Amino acid sequence: MAVRRLFWRVLVAGIPRRGVSVLIFSHRSFRILVGCALALAACEQPRTQVAVQSDDFGDPVRIGQPPTRIVSLNPVTTEMLFAFGAGSRLVGRSQFDLWPDSARLIPDLGNGLQPNVEIVLGAHPDLVILYASQDNRPAAARFRAAGVSTLSLRTDHIADFRRTVQMLGAILRDSARARAVSDSVFRTLGRVRAATTNLPRPTVFWHIWDAPLITIGAGSFMTELVDIAGGKNVYADITGPSATVSLEDVARRDPDFILAGPQGVQKISEDRRWRIVRAVREGKVLKVDTVLVGRPGVRLGEAAVSLANLLHPGTLH
């Protein structure tokens, strides 16, 4: 549980600490994404329709009218809401919801795990969106008991992104825009996969945290991103999303490249113990923007392009 909570804080929340840096995506690219979605969203579902969904806790979600006061304590869904053009409906966010820049203007209601229920209810939301962690089950129950619609979601795999987008689209009565956003992301992912399919597939170790040393497993969408980008995760045999490993085992698995955030790259370069890994000795430690590639949201396509160009320079532009 401790490793899983740390994994949330580093990858989903994107704490700028020890191997993690925060990069704010350009407003121009964000406007292009939203503009494409608007152009394709030609119709909406009737606003009187009641949305009946089951969230990732298996709890029912019933909303009679599109929500107008949303608290999103899940950075992935906050980004999606802005892509839907629904950012103005947000009345609360987690402290880690920093993209796009306009998200910073929304009141910060905590870190997104075990939220203060009274503070959140003080924002008078008609919908609360949580990260579907066991830590958040009690809060979800309390929000429902208070009569507030609550949606708990997690996106462990790329396929979960499409489902999450579709669910938000149904709740907002804007399924056409949801399809537009989803299709745009998957077109980009398809383009990256097509460009890397016939290329050599270097092996990769993804450095997430150093004390303890944490990496990603097959259960993480980031392993899927590595595959799409033309690489292979040396810990793809681990079924979970993350795992604690030893430096000696990393050396035995002998990755061609190491991926790490800016401070992680610095840590590896300064710690002589890492010299037992061939990729370190050969200078093949690659710096990634952990927030961009660590959130399975509307920038998944951008993340895949970034990784492909790291592993196969010049492949995509």
Residues of each region from the PLM?
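Bacterial N-terminal signal peptides that target proteins for export
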Residues: 3-33
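Short helix-initiation/N-cap motifs at beta->coil->alpha
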Residues: 54-58, 109-118, 134, 238-247
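Bacterial signal peptide processing site
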Residues: 44-46
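C-terminal motif of bacterial Sec signal peptides marking the signal peptidase cleavage site
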Residues: 40-42
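A short, structured surface patch at a secondary-structure boundary
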Residues: 69-123, 127-134, 139, 234
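Extracytoplasmic substrate-binding proteins
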Residues: 50, 60, 126-127, 137-214, ...
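Short helices/loops that flank or line small-molecule/ion binding pockets
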Residues: 117-124, 146, 244-254
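His/Asp/Glu-enriched short active-site or ligand-binding loop at hydrolase and phosphoryl-transfer sites
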Residues: 94, 218-242, 286-287
